[in-house]
């Protein structure tokens, strides 16, 4: 959520910055609402003060034995006018608040302008795509050779965009998860968390999935503020429960930065992606991910973004997977982000790089929604923290990359050295 003071006092500047994201701010309506809000605010304050004064006058008149009925009628009339003004003010503030919740974050000045992924800027590359002297198989065929990827069984159990893994493929999937968690907790300083996979309405508002992206969620009942406690949604990412741990909290400065990680399944309806990536594991309704979240002081958030991105890169480097680092343009960034790096891994069967991690600085956008603050040593007034999140990594897509990049001519898969301890010493599968 954007700073309300910016919307009140620097509306044209905000509109100009959001225009870089191809978002048209309704300046005229907002300005009109703000003018009316100010009038109503003054009116309610004046009516309240006048009503209080008349109420006191009733007591004084009563003690003097005077007729207080005219004053009572006046107090009642003031109360009716006050109630009407408050009702209008509350409705207007609610409308302004709802509109503010629909506004994306302001992009950082370093973010390039652009419309979509074609305008993103490549920052660097690591590793050289391997040259093969045999026909390249994709991960679906390799999984079938190993007997470990069964999409037909998943269709029978549930439907499209699900998978059943078994045997060595299931073990490799688990090994990747354990390797990522161990790397982030033992070398990168994150604290592992186990989290609920169902979250409530407030959590989804806190991280920005609601109200804009309700169609992307799987939910148990329609999500609204009045719903009972059974109105939950399956998490689209561990970012939601991890980040909401600091909702309505004041953190002491000495406790920052907070670095948290978790492995969870993620559930997404993939609304709007019909017909895209229908083969294999690339785009699933249910997939596993190891998530990284950092909570930092505002001055440290850009440095933290570089650090977090390097943590995701380290996973790819140790797995010997070629990738490129891309700075997203403002037209391709997520709703809550002010700056994002994507890591795209090389997939030989597609002869292209595909996203495997997205690392974002959210600045104070989520913190303001969640009222997540810290108290500095010098200034006792709590200030908003900055939050960051990143994939470290998407496990299913990492499995795809390992299968395709480390395939052999006979269809077997060479296990990267860092995974062999998690595979009971196996050097190959298939």
UniProtKB/Swiss-Prot annotation:
Pathway: Aminoacyl-tRNA biosynthesis; selenocysteinyl-tRNA(Sec) biosynthesis; L-seryl-tRNA(Sec) from L-serine and tRNA(Sec): step 1/1. It is found in: Cytoplasm. GO terms for biological process: selenocysteine biosynthetic process; seryl-tRNA aminoacylation. Its EC number is 6.1.1.11. It catalyses: tRNA(Ser) + L-serine + ATP = L-seryl-tRNA(Ser) + AMP + diphosphate + H(+); tRNA(Sec) + L-serine + ATP = L-seryl-tRNA(Sec) + AMP + diphosphate + H(+). L-serine binds at residues 237-239, 291, 391. It comes from the Bacteria. Pfam families: Seryl_tRNA_N, tRNA-synt_2b. One of its GO terms (cellular component) is cytoplasm. One of its GO terms (molecular function) is ATP binding. The keyword Chloroplast does not apply. ATP binds at residues 268-270, 355-358. Keywords: Aminoacyl-tRNA synthetase, ATP-binding, Cytoplasm, Ligase, Nucleotide-binding, Protein biosynthesis. Residues 103-127 are annotated as: Disordered. InterPro entries: aa-tRNA-synt_IIb (IPR002314), aa-tRNA-synth_II (IPR006195), aa-tRNA-synth_II/BPL/LPL (IPR045864), Ser-tRNA-ligase_type_1 (IPR002317), Ser-tRNA-synth_1_N (IPR015866), SerRS_1_N_sf (IPR042103), SerRS_core (IPR033729), tRNA-bd_arm (IPR010978). Gene3D superfamilies: Bira Bifunctional Protein, Domain 2 (3.30.930.10), Serine-tRNA synthetase, tRNA binding domain (1.10.287.40). Homodimer. The tRNA molecule binds across the dimer. HAMAP family: Ser_tRNA_synth_type1 (MF_00176). Consists of two distinct domains, a catalytic core and a N-terminal extension that is involved in tRNA binding. Catalyzes the attachment of serine to tRNA(Ser). Is also able to aminoacylate tRNA(Sec) with serine, to form the misacylated tRNA L-seryl-tRNA(Sec), which will be further converted into selenocysteinyl-tRNA(Sec). Belongs to the class-II aminoacyl-tRNA synthetase family. Type-1 seryl-tRNA synthetase subfamily. This is Serine--tRNA ligase. It comes from Sodalis glossinidius (strain morsitans).
């Amino acid at each position: 959520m954007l700073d309300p003071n910016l919307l009140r006092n620097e509306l044209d500047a905000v509109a100009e910055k959001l225009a870089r994201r191809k978002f048209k701010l309704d300046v005229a309506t907002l300005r009109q609402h703000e003018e009316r809000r100010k009038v109503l605010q003054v009116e309610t304050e004046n009516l309240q003060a006048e009503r209080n004064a008349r109420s006191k006058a009733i007591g004084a008149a009563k003690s003097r034995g005077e007729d207080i009925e005219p004053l009572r009628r006046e107090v009642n009339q003031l109360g009716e006018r006050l109630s009407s003004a408050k009702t209008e003010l509350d409705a207007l503030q609610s409308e302004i608040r709802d509109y503010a919740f629909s506004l994306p974050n302001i992009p950082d000045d370093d973010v390039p302008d652009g419309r979509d992924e074609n305008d993103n800027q490549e920052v660097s590359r690591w590793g050289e795509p391997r040259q093969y002297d045999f026909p390249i198989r994709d991960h679906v065929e390799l999984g079938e050779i190993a007997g470990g990827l069964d999409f037909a069984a998943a269709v029978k159990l549930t439907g499209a965009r699900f998978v059943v893994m078994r045997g060595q493929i299931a073990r490799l999937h688990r090994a990747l998860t354990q390797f990522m968690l161990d790397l982030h907790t033992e070398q990168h300083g994150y604290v592992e968390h186990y989290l609920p996979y169902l979250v409530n309405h407030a959590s989804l508002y806190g991280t920005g999935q609601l109200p804009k992206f309700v169609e992307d969620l799987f939910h148990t009942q329609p999500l609204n503020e009045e719903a009972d406690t059974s109105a939950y949604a399956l998490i689209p990412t561990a970012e939601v429960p991890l980040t909401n741990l600091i909702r309505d909290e004041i953190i002491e400065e000495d406790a920052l930065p907070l670095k948290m990680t978790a492995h969870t399944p993620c559930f997404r309806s993939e609304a709007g992606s019909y017909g895209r990536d229908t083969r294999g594991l690339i785009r699933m309704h249910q997939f596993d991910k190891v998530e990284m979240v950092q909570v930092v002081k505002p001055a440290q958030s850009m440095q933290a973004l570089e650090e977090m991105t390097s943590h995701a890169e380290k996973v790819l480097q140790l797995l010997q997977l070629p990738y490129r680092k891309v700075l997203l343009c403002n037209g391709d960034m997520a709703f809550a982000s002010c700056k994002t790096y994507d890591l795209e891994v090389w997939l030989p069967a597609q002869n292209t790089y595909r996203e495997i991690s997205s690392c974002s600085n959210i600045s104070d956008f989520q913190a303001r929604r969640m009222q997540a603050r810290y108290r500095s040593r010098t200034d006792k007034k709590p200030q908003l923290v900055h939050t960051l999140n990143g994939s470290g990594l998407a496990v299913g897509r990492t499995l795809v990359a390992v299968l395709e990049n480390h395939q052999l001519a006979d269809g077997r898969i060479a296990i990267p050295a860092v995974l062999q301890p998690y595979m009971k010493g196996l050097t190959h599968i298939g």
